[in-house]
């Protein structure tokens, strides 16, 4: 599986000699549209397991013209993750970090996650509301999210559409965040 995705998959841009590759652990499902792109400028470890024998599945979906990019350093996603990049959306991850069990990352527009930004268990980041339309003038179903460098997203926090989290912030457990979070708060 790893050999096929790293050497023969046109949707994934890799260069093994320059440490730009994907490691897909057991019980991971990848669904990449023929016009999707996964750009790796560093190692991307999908579905990392600490408990030997666990069958908790991790999923990665990138739809038509969707783009996911690991920009700088190694990025590890633990098991139980659900990452979805919808049609025409762009997900940028800085790298040099990891996200624990149960990541739920849904990108319909644009999500940018800075370098050295990690997360605890069951973190949810979504830039959309599931295409539920509300009849309010100017209402948008998806708004970009920006999470800057050195941010820590703790257990069970949810980052909502339109959020900007400045560098060095710590988002506390079970928080629902929408709007602007200042640096080092």
Positions of the model-derived regions?
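C-terminal segments of enzyme domains that contribute to small-molecule binding surfaces
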Residues: 136-161, 185
């Amino acid at each position: 599986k790893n050999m096929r995705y790293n050497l023969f998959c046109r949707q994934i841009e890799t260069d093994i000699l320059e440490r730009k590759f994907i490691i897909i652990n057991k019980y991971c499902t990848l669904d990449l549209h023929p016009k999707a792109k996964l750009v790796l400028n560093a190692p991307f470890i999908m579905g990392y397991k600490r408990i030997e024998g666990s069958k908790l599945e991790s999923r990665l979906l990138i739809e038509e013209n969707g783009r996911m990019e690991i920009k700088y350093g190694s990025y590890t996603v633990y098991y139980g993750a659900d990452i979805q990049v919808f049609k025409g959306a762009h997900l940028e991850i800085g790298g040099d970090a990891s996200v624990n069990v149960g990541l739920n990352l849904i990108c319909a527009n644009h999500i940018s996650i800075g370098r050295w930004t990690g997360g605890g268990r069951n973190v949810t980041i979504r830039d959309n509301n599931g295409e539920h339309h509300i009849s309010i003038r100017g209402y948008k179903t998806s708004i970009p999210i920006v999470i800057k460098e050195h941010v820590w997203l703790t257990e069970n926090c949810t980052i909502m559409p339109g959020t900007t989290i400045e560098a060095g912030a710590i988002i506390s457990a079970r928080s629902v965040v929408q709007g602007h979070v200042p640096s080092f708060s």
